[in-house]
Amino acid sequence: MDSSLEIKTITTLPKEYVNQNISVFNKVLSSLETISELAKDHLKSITSKDGRISNSLLEKHQFRAHGLAWFETYRIGLRETFNWIKLLQDTKNDTDLEYAVMVYAFSEYLNQMRYGIMISQSEVIRPSTLNVDDEKFSFFNSPDVQELIKYGASDNISQIMISSMENGIFPNLGLNDDTL
């Protein structure tokens, strides 16, 4: 994460922020999908022989394969968190707490996906590991995405989540199962 990131006190509640910026979340998810396809195509090209995945080539490029798996876990996690919010909206079970969780996740994961996902103390997956040019992450530098990252990293978002948990209030999982 950029240490010069200025974190301001927020005045817009998370639910309102997300609803006002839904197109930003869609843009992020679409951009990450494009990056994912490029990374998968590259990995397939360097691990295939005679039209099939080669065990020896996969072993040779294990770090990249492992890195792509981590990247995909983050990308799909963001997509499904976004879908979770849509489900909660549709069933009118959404509160600011769930939106706070989502914007926090987008802020944290986007920074890691852009600058490096630490998979161990000595291994960091960066876009270059996946053969992704910086240009493909240009969406990250747009003012609306930078605002999302700042908003999600704000003390107010953290405080909403911490305060809720301290008071025994947890996010609605939206699983429609009364036993959970």
Spans of model-derived segments:
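Flavin-dependent oxidoreductase catalytic core characteristic
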Residues: M1-L180
